[in-house]
């Protein structure tokens, strides 16, 4: 199984012999593709390109989003942010709380000169954004701003201002810490509820 941000890379991975493709859209937390293709656009494109099963990722945290991904041709979904914020997650409580308190637009893509990465806005993000907006920042300068183990500082050690807080846009839909079981049951139940609602629609 290989994660891809584009149909072009999906085709290369299939040719190399992978058994399935995870197609991750621009909404995903952490490292992203340079193409910045959203999940809504990426999934159909990848499904039309490859014959192996496609697993949708990026911005999926609810049953409605899961059903939408399946409707576009995905045979499954990969859910990251919703489970990263679960009670059982090894992420720090401070990280979980900061992500839960955030809303729409609270995460941004940055570090495009290194590897495009979606982060929660904080003091570290502001320093990165300021350097990038200067127009002449080097990769080495960006690495210096990040410092060593930036994601470890933010996610696991709870430094919510000077650490790298990697989380997806779907964190905006999460308003409390649930167990993994509660999260899974909620997603599956909502997916089935919306599936039945769609089946009840009368076509002209």
Residues covered by each model-derived region:
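Active-site mouth loops of central-metabolism enzymes
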Residues: 1-3, 174
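Glycine/Thr-rich beta-alpha phosphate-binding loop at enzyme active sites
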Residues: 3-44, 86, 90-91
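Conserved active-site-proximal phosphate/metal-binding subdomains
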Residues: 33-55, 61-204
């Amino acid at each position: 199984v290989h994660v891809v941000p584009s149909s072009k890379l999906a085709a290369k991975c299939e040719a190399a012999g992978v058994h399935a493709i995870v197609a991750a859209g621009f909404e995903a937390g952490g490292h992203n593709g340079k193409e910045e293709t959203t999940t809504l656009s990426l999934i159909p494109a990848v499904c039309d390109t490859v014959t192996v099963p496609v697993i949708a990722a990026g911005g999926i945290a609810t049953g409605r989003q899961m059903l939408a991904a399946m409707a576009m041709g995905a045979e499954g979904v990969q859910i990251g942010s919703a489970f990263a914020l679960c009670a059982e997650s090894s992420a720090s409580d401070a990280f979980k709380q900061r992500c839960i308190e955030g809303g729409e637009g609270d995460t941004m893509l940055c570090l495009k000169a290194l590897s495009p990465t979606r982060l929660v806005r904080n003091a570290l993000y502001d320093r990165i954004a300021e350097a990038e907006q200067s127009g002449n920042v080097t990769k080495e300068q960006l690495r210096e701003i990040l410092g060593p183990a930036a994601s470890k500082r933010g996610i696991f050690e709870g430094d919510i201002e000077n650490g790298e807080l990697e989380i997806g846009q779907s964190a905006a839909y999460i308003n409390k810490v649930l167990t993994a079981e509660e999260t899974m049951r909620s997603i599956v139940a909502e997916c089935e509820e919306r599936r039945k609602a769609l089946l009840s629609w009368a076509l002209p």
